A protein has these predicted regions:
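Conserved catalytic-core segment of nucleotide-activated headgroup transferases in glycan assembly
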Residues: 77-88, 205, 215-289, 359
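C-terminal amphipathic helix plus adjacent low-complexity
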Residues: 39, 361-420
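Active-site and donor-binding regions of nucleotide-sugar-utilizing enzymes
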Residues: 69-226
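A donor-sugar binding/catalytic signature common to diverse glycosyltransferases
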Residues: 132-139, 143-156, 300-344
């Protein structure tokens, strides 16, 4: 027989009021983030806690004052910037170099747990290195509590900053939550910026104040000039049909399926007098319909292909500055410019920077290349605005790394956590 309980009216109203406020708060959280998001948040917290527990053991190991660690998740092999810095460092100093590069997809939902062996190796080297150099967001660099003696340099993998990233690109509560929990771009000692103009945007994107920034240029600018002839001959040996031809290089940034209009520009140049090189982003899965005059040249990098390009078409990537450093005619194919201004957003207006060489229509762009002479002052002014150092850039960058990192005599080698 079911027992009956008598509750006073006042208690009923109080209970209802408490329940109302409780469920109102829960519903607000669910509407803002969602239950799955809340679970993910606590899984991230648990993952980071476990990583730091493991890392505390590695931090008992001594620091090698001549050890420099390079970390990247942009590619499975070292970038030209990393390789040139390593070469110059080894020439200037007696250093121990460790390079760890592995491409990690941006699905943060399970990234903490699927890459544990990699993270453990990174933790060992972070705990025993004096200097760490990264070219993008790296989980172990940002979420771990490091020794005070570890100096971390961020040399962002893109020469420019046309499109927003990092903190300036966060649009939703979910993105903000993920960025906060994964401590996005935390723990950097110094961030390298190619100009005062770019530094202004980097401060917003990385979330750092003035004293964390150093002026310096990526070594790729030097590489483009010193290896121009060598790269051209390599490509000509592989593609002898490129000799004495007018070549158009198209190197767009990544697009998801459904937003990609690359096929339109391929069609515009098919059966023309130009050879067309299509160099899409590594993450692109779209298949294109191409003819015999279109090449993908997948065995060569965009930097190498710039050596044979007579015309360069790109959009919001750093390729525009890389091509401009060689005074190549640069055209912006910004068919989704209005959408990009909304998400992720633009730091500076490429439509204003390039004027009549900015296009949203592929056939109009083709007509411009085919019939109009290019005003190279446009790319000269553009490059000089966003990149200030052009001579001995690798040596100057390595000098900064040595001065601010390896020769930091005031470092305390005891086990202190690095302050933000």
């Amino acid at each position: 027989m079911m027992k009956s309980f008598r509750i006073s009216k006042g208690k009923i109203n109080g209970a209802r009021l408490t329940a109302f406020f409780f469920f109102d708060i829960v519903n607000r959280v669910r509407l803002t983030l969602g239950v799955e998001c809340m679970i993910q948040k606590y899984l991230i917290k648990v993952g980071i806690f476990l990583l730091n527990c493991s890392y505390s053991v590695f931090k008992l190991l001594p620091t090698n004052s001549n050890k420099v660690l390079f970390l990247s998740r942009q590619s499975n092999k070292p970038s030209i910037d990393f390789r040139m810095i390593v070469s110059q460092l080894e020439e200037d100093r007696d250093v121990k170099i460790v390079i760890m590069t592995k491409r990690i997809e941006k699905n943060m939902k399970d990234v903490l747990f699927k890459n544990v062996p990699l993270f453990l190796r990174q933790m060992y080297h972070l705990a025993t290195s004096k200097v760490c150099i990264v070219d993008g967001y790296n989980i172990t660099v940002s979420v771990l509590n490091h020794k005070k003696c570890l100096i971390i340099f961020q040399i962002w993998h893109s020469l420019g900053a046309a499109k927003k990233f990092g903190y300036s690109a966060l649009k939703t509560p979910y993105q903000q939550m993920i960025a906060k929990e994964l401590k996005m771009h935390k723990n950097y000692s110094y961030i390298i910026a190619p100009s005062m103009e770019i530094k202004k945007y980097f401060k917003q994107c990385f979330g750092y104040k003035e004293d964390h920034f150093l002026l310096g240029t990526l070594p790729r600018i030097e590489y483009l000039k010193t290896h121009h002839r060598v790269n051209k001959e390599k490509i000509y040996r592989k593609y002898p049909q490129f000799r004495n031809k007018k070549i158009v290089l198209y190197a767009p940034t990544f697009r998801t399926q459904g937003t990609d209009r690359t096929q339109e520009i391929i069609d515009a140049f098919q059966n023309s007098k130009y050879l067309f090189i299509l160099k899409v982003h590594p993450n692109t899965k779209t298949k294109y319909h191409i003819s015999n005059c279109v090449y993908d040249c997948r065995e060569f990098s965009t930097l190498q292909l710039l050596s044979v390009a007579d015309y360069v078409i790109t959009d919001y990537s750093g390729t525009s500055l890389e091509a401009a450093s060689l005074k190549k005619p640069v055209y912006i194919y910004g068919y989704d410019f209005e959408d990009y201004q909304k998400d992720p957003g633009m730091n500076y207006d490429l439509k204003k920077e390039f004027g009549k060489y900015f296009f949203e229509d592929a056939h109009a762009l083709y007509e411009c290349i085919a019939h109009e002479k290019y005003d190279k002052q446009v790319v000269i002014d553009y490059f000089n605005k966003y990149v200030v150092q052009t001579q001995d850039v690798t040596q100057k960058l390595v000098d900064l790394i040595i001065e601010k990192g390896l020769e930091d005599e005031e470092t305390d080698y005891r086990l202190f956590e690095k302050t933000s």
